[in-house]
Design a protein with these regions (language model features):
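A surface-exposed partner-binding patch
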Residues: 1-141, 213-229
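Alpha-helical interaction segments
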Residues: 47, 61, 104, 169, ...
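A short, compositionally biased
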Residues: 131, 152-154
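Hydrophobic side chains in beta-strands
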Residues: 136-138, 149, 159
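Broad, structure-driven detector of short, well-ordered beta-strand segments within folded domains
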Residues: 143-150
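Short aromatic-glycine-(Arg/Gly/Cys) micro-motifs in beta-strand/loop hairpins
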Residues: 154-160
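Compact, glycine/acidic-enriched structural inserts
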Residues: 161-187
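Acidic, proline/glycine-rich low-complexity IDRs
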Residues: 184-229
Length: 229
């Protein structure tokens, strides 16, 4: 199911999960997709950040949407149906995606504050993960999902923890577009790391072809072919 970036297919995947979650009695919000940003709007934010946005992220803002929101919540259903999810994916209860050009400066303010006050030591392995990142999604538990700005792994999507998660600094996609397509194919579970971790495969990142993803599709009543173009 690994696929090249296709925004229409990406939307199809997200809407399919909203449909399945709603059918179960879960809570959902309509997928929100705002119009693309202009070159001038992007350059204005880049000037304040002090760098050019990573290319895959920049292209999505410019060609597809300047702001997107996706959300579902299955917690109450799962409390009443405690055996619905098998053990290997039992930590899943919601899915949330929220990114936008309008959020970048706020998230950079958060990142810079944490770096200065809590993680200032670039020579420390844990602290270093908070340096030279472009935060684009805030996770409910206070963690972030970011894009690497260091030259060695530039453009990769990385999980950034504030409280000692073993997944701190873990790369979960080679680039933003791959991240969107693969994460959408499992319904954007989380974004807390314990909700996407069942779908993580070493050297592949979030992997919609893994065994746990097939289990997830089965319990939701999704035929994997429905997630294809």
């Amino acid at each position: 199911m690994i696929s090249i970036f296709n925004f229409e297919l990406f939307k199809k995947r997200l809407n399919l999960f909203l449909e399945k979650i709603e059918d179960l009695g879960g809570e959902v919000e309509p997928l929100t997709i705002e119009k693309p940003a202009t070159e001038e709007e992007i350059k204005a934010v880049e000037a304040q950040l002090g760098y050019t946005l990573p290319p895959h992220f920049r292209e999505v803002l410019l060609e597809n949407t300047a702001h997107l929101e996706f959300w579902w919540y299955l917690y109450h259903f799962l409390q009443k149906n405690k055996d619905f999810l098998p053990d290997e994916i039992c930590g899943i209860f919601q899915g949330k995606l929220r990114f936008g050009l309008d959020l970048l400066l706020l998230y950079e303010e958060h990142r810079a504050g944490w770096q200065k006050d809590v993680f200032p030591n670039y020579e420390d392995e844990y602290d270093r993960v908070w340096h030279n990142k472009m935060f684009f999604q805030k996770v409910f538990n206070g963690d972030y999902i970011a894009i690497e700005l260091e030259p060695d792994n530039y453009g990769k999507v990385v999980y950034v923890s504030h409280d000692g998660s073993e997944n701190h600094g873990l790369y979960i996609a080679d680039n933003f577009k791959e991240f969107l397509m693969n994460y959408a194919a499992v319904g954007w579970t989380g974004g807390e790391d314990w909700q996407w971790e069942p779908f993580y495969t070493k050297d592949k990142g979030i992997d919609p072809t893994c065994e746990n993803a097939q289990t997830w599709y089965k319990v939701l009543g999704i035929n994997p072919k429905e997630l294809e173009g």
